[in-house]
Amino acid sequence: MHKAGFVNIVGNPNVGKSTLMNQLVGEKLSIATFKAQTTRHRIMGIVNTEDTQIVFSDTPGVLKPNYKMQEMMLQFSESALADADILLYVTDVVEDPEKNMDFLEKVSKMSIPVILLINKIDESDQKTLGNLVTKWHGLLPNAEILPISAKNKFGVDILFKRVHELLPESPAFFDKDQLTDKPAKFFVSEIIREKILRYYDKEIPYSVEVVIERFKEDDRQIHISAIIYVERSSQKGIIIGHQGMALKKVSTEARKSLERFFDKKIFLETFVKVDKDWRNSQKELKHFGYSPE
């Protein structure tokens, strides 16, 4: 008997969905930073054994859209409700359980198994956790509730075992040697964007999109050319920095991470261009890959 299924991870921004995804898959596929709204796309990570295939899916945090880009991100999250065999709803110990009742209402009506994960329990106490469990039981009475700490891997093995038990009988959906549904270029752009998220403040990281113009690989090295798009000329100056030092720092850190990711020598070129108000342009969003399949 072979088991396979789509296990989709949803929840509000900054509750630890991407950290959990990376722990479950055993690879760093999703950006995880302290900033909210880090994940923009739906990213699949595939775990294979001889008789199972688990297709985990990380999604953008659910939020009220302010831009067309965020509308697209919300569509990624809602599509994860539609095709899930098992749903992992992630919250944490400080989030108000009633923060996003519209989305929660959709989750409560689902007929598939739902596991409610209360993350970051290392930052809480037993009384607070107990009160949260009671509150969540009232909001999602049909969900299983599991306290975890994704960062510290606490409860992750228990979760993985439970997911395996709940998987439906099915043939594999992907080749057994496949790790993700995304191409190499996608992870290059995400790694560069992660460095921008870490090194720039305020609105700058959220106004950035990274496009890989060139990706040429041989046995020993990879040559990459990346364009960092911003919305305004003033943002371009901030990204580049005085005498190009800020961009150089980001590029150097990105290159180091890329060399670890691909286990090859990386030659990375980065350029900065202005694409005015791209976050509200349907045409540009489609060009940048923000179209749910």
List the model feature ranges, each with a label.
Residues 113, 122-180:
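Canonical P-loop GTPase G-domain recognition
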Residues 58, 119, 149:
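Active-site glycine-centered loops adjacent to acidic/histidine catalytic or metal-binding residues
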